[in-house]
Amino acid sequence: MFYTKLKNTYDNKNRLTERTAKEKKTGKETVHTYRYNAYGDVAVQDDTQFVYGDVSGQVTKETTKLTKNKDVVKNYTYDSKGNKSTFSVKAGEDTKLSLSYEYDGSSRLISVKDSEGNQAVSYAYDTEGSLSERQAANGLKTTYGYDYQNRLTSMTNETGKGVVSKYSSTYLKNGQKAEEVSTVMDKNGKSTKKTAAYTYDMLGRITRETKTGREDISYTYDANNNRKQMTIGNKTTAYQYNKNDELLRTDTLHTDTEKNDVVIYKNDKNGNQLATVNRSEIPAEAKDTSYIDVDVTLGDNQLNDNVVNHYNALNQLTETLTKNYKVSFTYDAEGLRTGKTVNGEKTVYVWDGDQVVMELSKGGAVQKRYISGNDLVYADKGENTEKTYYVTDMHGNVVQLLDESGNVTKTYEYDSFGNEVKPEKKDENPYRYCGEYYDKETEEVYLRARYYESSVGRFITRDTYTGESDEPLSLHLYTYCENDGVNAWDPSGHYKIKMKHINGMKWKKNWKGRKWTKKNISMMNALLKKYGIKKKKSIALMMATCDQESGQGRIMQEEGDDNYCRSHGYTVYTKGAGYIQITGNDQLDFLSYIGVKPKTNRTEQISKKYAWEAACWEWGICQKGGHSMNKYVSDHGKSISVFLITQYYINGWPYSKGDKKYEQFNSDMISLRKKTKKFSYNRKKIVV
C-alpha cells in the first residue's frame, strides 16, 4: 500500500533531534522529537519530560501530558546500588499508585509494598540465584524446583486452603520440554490432572502436541520455515504464502463434513497484514477461489467476519476494523503503546520500564492498576478496591485468577502457540498467554514491537530485527519463537527468549568461556589502541569492569522481564548492551561514533556485533575526560555496579582472605593485577 521514507535530524553534537517517517504514497508523516539537557541526557521526548538524579544519572521524574490541564507524573527513587526503591504515579494532583521495593545483597528483589506498607509480594532465592519461593498478599505461595542444569522442573501454587495448581516437567537432552504433568483446580473446586507431551523435528520446531482431554495437534513446515499444515482432530488447515513469506490464504478442511473454510489475507508493500476475509463453508472441491477479493475500504456494514488494519509510516498498527469494533492505537517514541480507543472509549497506558502499571481514562480516572514485582502479582481498580491475583504455569502463562481469599475465580488453558482452549467473550482480563496483554477486540497479543496472531502462529508485520546468520530460523521475519512456543517466549516482538533463564537475563556464549585466539587477540589489541586504553591500570580496570558488569563475561545484553532492568528505567530497546552495559543515549552516541545506522533494537544490535568495541569506547570516554580512576569510581561506581571491584584494584580488596567473595574475584582476575605491560587472561596474552 505504501513504502516508507525515514529521515533523522541531528544537532551540532550529532545527537538525534527528530525522526520522521513518511509514507511515500500518501505523504502522511510520523514524527518524534528529542531535546537534551546539559549532560547529554534526553530531557524532552515528544510530550514527555525527564529529570535525572545528580549522582546516578537515573530518571527520577517523568512527566507526560494527559490533557491540556493535567499531566501524568512518575517519580522514582533509588538505593545506593542503583536499584529502584520507590515508584509513584500521579494523574493531575492525585496519587494513583505508590510502591516501595526491597532487595537482598545481590540486588535481587525480595519485597514489594504498597503505600500503606502492606506487602504485595515477596521473593526468595536459592544458592544458585534462582527463584525458589514467591509469596503474594492473599496467601498464594509458589515454590520452584530445579534440576542440576538449573532447569525448572517443578512448580506448586498453593493457598491456605491447599494446592490450586502444580506442574512438573521433563526435558530432552537438547533442553526442550518433553512432557509436562499439571494438576489445576477450577472455580468449582475440582482439580484435574493432565499430561502434555511434545515432539520436535531436527530444527527444534514443534511437530506434535498431545494433552489429556484434548485433540492431538500436529504441524508441518515448508522449506522457508513457514507453517505448511496444521491438523487438529478432523480439521486440517493448509497455509499459502508468497515469496516474501507473507501469508496469503488458509484452507481448513473438515473431513467429517467436506466443508472448506477459506481465509484470504491482503498485505501492503511493507509486508503489513492489511485485511483478512473469511469465506466459510466453501465446498472442498472448489479449488478456484480467485474470485474472492479483499476490499480494504470496507465500511462498517460490510465487514461481517472480516478484519481491516491500518498502519502509520513506522508500520505500527494504528487502527483495526471488525464487525463489532473500531479500535485505534497510539505509541510513544520508544514504540510502546500509549493508548487504545475502542468504539470511542479511550484507555491510556502508563508504563514502568516495559510493563504496564496502570490504565487510565482519557480524563485521568483509574480503570485498572497492575502491581508487579518480578512478575505480575495482582490487578485492582484503585485504592481499597477488590484485587484479582494472577497464577501462572511454568511457561509464564496466566492459568488462574484468584480473589483476595485465595479462591479460584477463572481458569485458562492454551495450546503451544497461545490459542485458548475455551475462550469466554465476556472475559475482561487482558493478561493471558505468556503473561502478556491480549486484545480481545482484535484477538491478538500485544508484544511491544509487534502484534502476535496466535491462530496462525505468526506476527502480523515484518520484524525490523533481521536475525542472525548463524541462527537460520531467526532470519524469518514473521514466525513466532522460531515455531517453538513451548520452550520460548517473545516479550519484545523481535526475538525469542529460551525458557532456560536466570533472573530474566539472556545468557550467551561469553568471552570468558571462549578461547582467546590470535584473531580475537589482534582484534582486542586494535580496539585498545584505537580508544587510547594503554595504561596497565586502565586495561586491568576496564577488563574488571567488563567482568563485573556482564556477570563474568556471560551477559552481553539485559532483556526479558528482569526486575533490575525495569527498576532502572531501561526500555525494551535501550537496556544494557555490550560487556560494559551501555544504555539509552550512550548507545546512539556510540553507533554514531563508529558510523553505523541505529536499528530499532539498539541493545541487540550492539550486543551482537559491537560488544567489545562498545566497552572500549565507553572506557575510552572516561580516559579522554581526564578522570582519574578514583574520581571515576566516585562519580560512577555505584551506578555501573563496579564499586567493589574497582576498589579492589585501586585501594585493595576490602574483604579478608578466605571470604567467599574475595576468593571468587581473586581467582578469576589475579592476572589483571600484575604490574606488567601485558594483559594476561585465560592463559593467553593481550599485548599493548
What are these regions (language model features)?
Residues 1-8, 18-26, 32, 44-50, ...:
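Beta-turn initiation residues at beta-strand->coil junctions
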Residues 4, 98, 121, 285-297, ...:
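Low-complexity, glycine/serine/proline-rich disordered segments
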Residues 8, 34, 50-51, 76, ...:
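A residue-level detector for well-ordered beta-strand positions
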Residues 54, 100-101, 105, 233, ...:
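A motif-centric feature for acidic-aromatic and gly/ser/thr-rich catalytic loops and repeats
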Residues 337, 401, 419-421, 453-460, ...:
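Short, low-complexity export/processing leader segments characterized by acidic and small residues
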Residues 420-424, 487-488, 548-562, 625, ...:
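Secretory-pathway/luminal and periplasmic proteins that interact with or process carbohydrate-rich
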Residues 497-523, 537-624:
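Peptidoglycan-targeting cell-wall enzymes and recognition modules
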Residues 546-550, 628-658:
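Acidic helix/loop microenvironments that form the catalytic cleft of cell-wall polysaccharide enzymes
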